[in-house]
Amino acid sequence: MPDVMKRTPASVIRWLFSSEDGASDRLLPRWFFLRGLGLIYFSAFYSLVFQIKGLIGPNGILPADEYLRELTKLGVVRFWYAPTLLWFSSSSHMLNAICYVGLIAAVLLVLNVWPRAMLALCFACFLSFVSAAQDFSGYQSDGMLLEAGFISLFFAPPGVRPGLGGDDPPSRASLFLLQWEWFRIYFESGMVKLASGDPQWRDFTAMDEYYQNGPLPTWIGWYVQHLPHKLHTFATGATLVLELVLVWMLFLPRRWRIACFFIVTLWQVPVILTANYTFLNYLVLLLGVLLLDDRFLQRWLSQPLLTRIDDRTQAASPDRTAPEEDHAVRAFSHINALKLAFTSVMLSWIFYSTLVQMLWIPFGRLPLPTSPVIALEPFRIANRYGLFAVMTRGRYEIEFQGSNDGETWMAYPFRHKPQDPTKAPGIYAPYQPRLDWNLWFASLGAWRDNMFVVSAEERLLANDSDVLSLFASNPFGKNAPKLVRAVIWRYWFTSLAERHATGMWWRRESLGLYAPTLTHMPDGKLGVVEWPPPAMPRP
């Protein structure tokens, strides 16, 4: 930050927020980051292509049109509360459109075609889903992607084929905010672990059953679960040290920052292999690339590759020569001033909102202005993070079953989450099966707090094809069952001896009914055949 304290306020703003005075040593990290961000957006939209109609379609579990119709009671405020393109239409065609437009934009972003415009399309399409998805969009990974995607609008180079964008290096503020997001994901996760008071983090037993009890485990996690207890104790302590201490290396000189990148990257690899956290870990890894610089990456990349990356830079660089006419010069200057003002306000706003939310974790609600924080909440671009504040005790799984006589029940097989004890848990991240994920969260609470489970029962009772597409198969074929229920099981990894003797990956025990058993009454209305107990047993 040479001589920055001696500058005028206007020059400091330009130094922070304009690309002309930007971080010219981060062209390669920016190039790789934006290509990777395109891949992550692609994975998010690809997952939605196969699920969106079953989740929020007109015949889905939580129809977007019903939700938005209810929000019309808010008046014009509804457009702020739910910023989504689905206000124009929430038909199946529109849902498919936002997925495929997002997919195409993500591919073009990967190909470095008009990156700013493609980032805007990806952000608008993904925000449109998240804002209307209700229970199916409460994940921290969604907020992480939207925050990174929005800041990248200011981080990316202009132009249709900008190459490395050497004439438009990333502004220091946009680079810092992306690094700041990376830092907060780790540090806030560490803080919430201590602030929650969960004894498992304090006595270093948090990792003892982590691989079994997480949302969607993998077969590698099964093996890691059976490692000696001392290794799990070490992993617990190392997690806290990494999240609370090591990430501060971001703010140290260059060599420390690069060392931090390698430590954190190596730590993420076993996390990816032992659990399916959709695109979350890949996005965190990608944000970490911004800890590197051109000098480091140039040592590892061949000259032909560097030339290929930047082969269109000169041809696509914007013309910076000043127009000859005075009025054009003034117009050009005014436009640049407005762009700089908007960038300065927007990025400062995001930083303030995220800083305030981070301070709330250890200090509670400080007497600071909260209106700026609240104003950005619906857009998910200034978030508070905190992964695994409290470790789950036990693994519970909800299963949908149908019957024609009330005696013989057949289960609807899931595509991804644990169900069949003989089936090995798979590895499929960054794909995100949102129904499977939500059922894991629902299993930890009561059905009345997770009404999407009852909605899913209704759609299965109607044999709806959109909702059935979320499952591996339909045990009832073309004829709808007469009764549908949701039951709950407790699951455990089998021991090494049990696995060797039986070939099973899981043991499970039935805990009974989770949600009401539904049927169609003679008059065609929905009826309840059996109610679950008031409180679910949690052994």
Where are the predicted features?
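Alpha-helical membrane-anchoring segments
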Residues: 2-539
